[in-house]
């Protein structure tokens, strides 16, 4: 359950930054958001990626353009279904953990539009 461990650590870390985690593993057909949190009035959609070693690339390098497109689609669905509109203040980000899920280095990477 390496992915679940990484997501649990990521959620705890985001909470330590003052965020309220409001959803985990939000799924639609063909897309998923690992964590949805509130940072003040802004909803933040976070993809969590963890790599134990960089032998096959870093955690950040594992996020493909296709994954980003699916993430955007899932974020729009969340806004529409959970809040009835798509124009709320929000942002997307990737939280990477390079190394073991329980002690690897965490990095937060904001995404554009």
UniProtKB/Swiss-Prot annotation:
It comes from the Bacteria. InterPro entries: Restrct_endonuc-II-like, tRNA_endonuc-like_dom_sf, UPF0102_YraN-like. GO terms for molecular function: nucleic acid binding. PANTHER family: UPF0102 PROTEIN YRAN (PTHR34039:SF1). Belongs to the UPF0102 family. This is UPF0102 protein Dgeo_1894. It comes from Deinococcus geothermalis (strain DSM 11300 / CIP 105573 / AG-3a).
